[in-house]
Design a protein with these regions (language model features):
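SAM-dependent methyltransferase catalytic region
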Residues: 2-375, 381, 403-407
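C-terminal effector/catalytic modules and regulatory tails appended to multi-domain proteins
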Residues: 31-37, 613-617, 640
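C-terminal substrate-recognition regions of SAM-dependent nucleic acid methyltransferases
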Residues: 78, 82, 90, 299, ...
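A structural signal for short hydrophobic/aromatic patches embedded in well-ordered alpha helices
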Residues: 95, 208, 576, 644-645
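Short conserved catalytic/interaction loops centered on acidic-Pro-aromatic/His motifs
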Residues: 221-224, 588-592, 641-642
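Short, amphipathic C-terminal "tail helix"
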Residues: 639-652
Length: 652
């Protein structure tokens, strides 16, 4: 059976509870739409306009729908704006189970124990304490972590006994431990008052409020065999409007509220700044007082959440001029979550675990060095969690507990075998990294001499990239290249690049390109990105890199390639190329290669070898034999060797 939110809306309206559920306790007005998804219906549906009963009933009945019922175009628009990905029920269940394991200090989630009878509490962990445990879902959307009335992907109703949300679990405890209606209502309200969520968009917030109040309704009806009355739900509705509030989680303010603020005479002065939206207020029910939400971030605050859980927005596509790039914002929500609770469990992109992606490198390292952080689950293929969604680097469920020390992650891989290999390799003598001899794809640059000789060249290049020896430079500036080595008085480099989607060589005057440390040396060359090569585990086995080749002195490359080494003799370059082709080296490269890019930093854990005749490796052997020498050098056992040879494809 599918959920029908409109039926809930009409039922609540008939009981006089719909209007109260539209209240914004901070502004004293109604919650705002905070989305342009309904603008086609007129200005009353603008993002800064209030949601009223008249706009969601009568002629507009059916306008508010769950995610599963929304028109495809609306889903697409909303998903793009803040890169929403909707949390599947099984993920909600796993994450909520873990919070219960932490609270109960025992294995198995609360709902699993319910199938065998009542939830087991004791004198140290009472059901009343469980009910009053303060838990918050950030950016809650329709509230999947709070209540699971239906499957968010399909809209199918979930039977009460199989629901797994935070409030579902509390209401279950209330039903099992109370004997009268009045006692049940008393503790159900306490459960509500200790369950929180905030959301940016008004329609989603309204749905989450409806889901919460209707979950109380359905739990009451199941326990007592009759529907609750309006008066019995009045306190519950009040708690819902305080505890589920509208907020921009990055500013702690009511979204778009300043567009509704009346201007004072002072505001009309020429230099006056527009008023900012008000900071959101929430209620501390234990002290019967309200606080600005931002005050919870202070060290001396009297109110903190016991647990924070959620699935924050991943990126913001509403800002910036680059249509191909949307800045990440999930790390900002992580930072803010750590300020309001000692214990935080979130699902989010995992690229930072490999010090990759667009989150700040300093932030990535801070997270990797944090002894209070652990990764509960890692999914290299994000579509395992979010169908039809591609997230480079995968997604992770992280758990942060300020009062526990798990040891810093420092280096993350999802495979135990790779972790042990990594420890052996890094701990083998004084570790030197291959990263030191890898040259970035942007090593070569055009010169002022070229621009002086070809003053119109700048107009043929991208803005801000007048000196880039770009991947498409052969097509962009054909006038500075020759197919064959010219017979004139100038000196030339042979440049490897791509033309008409194929590798090719062209000649360019030396004075048009800067010289690097390996320009006049032998070097190993690889494509700077190779999506088909894959990563460890995707596919199995994976190549990790493309095919390497040797370039000699006076050979250079466009930005399509990286180069490795600066060798005086070709034999050493050949030895390095053999090493790059080993399964061992590509496995170590795979520790940090979670996207198709192969920049120098990805080679951090590939150990540098001696490529001269004095090496402890006999480079005259085949690549397969060199692999065996490397396995022995680093003391790898059969299980570790088997992991490498099953996960990384052989290269001759």
């Amino acid at each position: 059976m599918l959920i029908h939110i409109q039926d809930d809306i009409l039922r609540l309206q008939g009981m006089g509870l719909l209007e109260p559920l539209l209240a914004d306790r901070t502004t004293g007005r109604n919650i705002l739409w905070a989305t342009d998804a309904y603008l086609e219906h007129g200005s009353r549906f603008a993002r800064n306009a209030p949601i009223t009963t008249a706009l969601i009933t009568g002629e507009y009945a059916g306008l508010i729908r769950t995610r599963a019922r929304k028109a495809f175009e609306q889903q697409s628009q909303r998903t793009k704006a803040r890169a929403e990905v909707f949390t599947p029920l099984w993920v909600v269940s796993q994450m909520a189970d873990y919070l219960d394991e932490v609270w109960f200090q025992r294995k198995a989630g609360i709902h699993k124990q319910y199938a065998d009878g009542h939830i087991s509490f004791n004198t140290n962990k009472t059901w009343q304490q469980y009910v009053e445990n303060r838990r918050l879902e950030i950016t809650c959307g329709e509230g999947p972590f709070l209540v699971s009335r239906y499957d968010a992907a399909t809209g199918e109703v979930i039977p009460l006994e199989k629901r797994v949300g935070l409030l579902d679990r509390k209401l279950r405890a209330v039903s099992e431990n109370t004997d009268t209606v009045s006692d049940w209502l008393h503790w159900a309200v306490k459960a509500l008052r200790a369950t929180y969520g905030y959301e940016f968009q008004g329609d989603s917030l309204l749905i989450s409020r409806i889901n919460v109040i209707m979950s109380v309704w359905e739990a009451f009806e199941t326990r007592w065999g009759q529907a609750p009355t309006a008066s019995q739900l009045r306190k519950a509705a009040e708690a819902v409007t305080w505890n589920l509030w509208q907020m921009d989680g990055l500013t702690d303010r009511v979204p778009y509220a300043r567009e509704n603020l009346q201007l004072s005479l002072f505001d009309l002065l020429p230099d006056a700044k527009p008023p900012l939206p008000p900071y959101c207020r929430i209620k501390n029910w234990r002290q019967q007082r309200t606080n600005q939400f931002r005050s919870l971030k202070g060290e001396r605050t009297r109110m903190k959440f016991d647990f924070v859980i959620g699935n924050p927005p991943y990126q913001d596509e509403t800002i910036g001029d680059n249509k191909g790039f949307a800045p990440p914002i999930y790390h900002l929500f992580i930072n803010e979550s750590y300020k309001i609770a000692n214990t935080v469990e979130l699902i989010h992109p995992a690229r930072f675990l490999f010090n990759a992606g667009s989150t700040p490198k300093a932030w990535n390292q801070k997270m990797l060095d944090d002894p209070h952080l652990r990764i509960l689950n890692y999914y290299a293929d994000a579509s395992e969690v979010f169908p039809n969604t591609s997230i480079n680097g995968g997604v992770a469920v992280s758990y942060h507990d300020e009062q526990s020390s798990f040891g810093a992650i420092q280096i993350f891989t999802k495979y135990n075998e790779l972790n042990t290999i990594l420890r052996k390799v890094v701990g083998h003598g004084p570790f030197e990294t291959m990263e030191e001899i890898v040259y970035t794809r942007t090593s070569y640059k055009l010169t002022d001499k070229m621009h002086n000789d070809y003053p119109n060249a700048k107009d043929q290049l991208s803005n801000g990239h007048a000196y880039d020896f770009a991947s498409n430079i052969f097509d962009r500036l054909p006038q500075i290249f020759s197919d064959d080595l010219p017979n004139d008085d100038h000196e030339y480099y042979r440049a490897l690049g791509r033309k008409n989607n194929a590798r090719t060589y062209m000649y360019i005057r030396k004075e048009y390109i800067n010289k690097t440390a390996n320009t006049d040396k032998y070097k190993v060359v690889l494509a700077k990105a190779d999506g088909a090569a894959g990563q460890i585990g995707s596919p199995v086995p994976a190549r990790i890199t493309g095919i390497s080749m040797i370039l000699g002195p006076n050979d250079i490359t466009t930005e399509s390639f990286i180069s490795i080494g600066s060798f005086e003799v070709e034999a050493e370059a050949n030895n390095a190329m053999k090493y790059v082709r080993t399964r061992f080296a590509r496995t170590m490269l795979g520790v940090l290669k979670v996207t198709q890019e192969l920049g120098p930093q990805k080679w951090k854990y590939v150990p540098l070898q001696d490529f001269t005749p004095n090496s402890d490796i006999d480079w005259s052997q085949s690549v397969a034999d060199i692999d065996r020498q490397l396995y022995a050098k680093y003391g790898l056992d059969e299980k570790e060797i088997s992991f490498i040879e099953t996960h990384v494809k052989e290269m001759a």
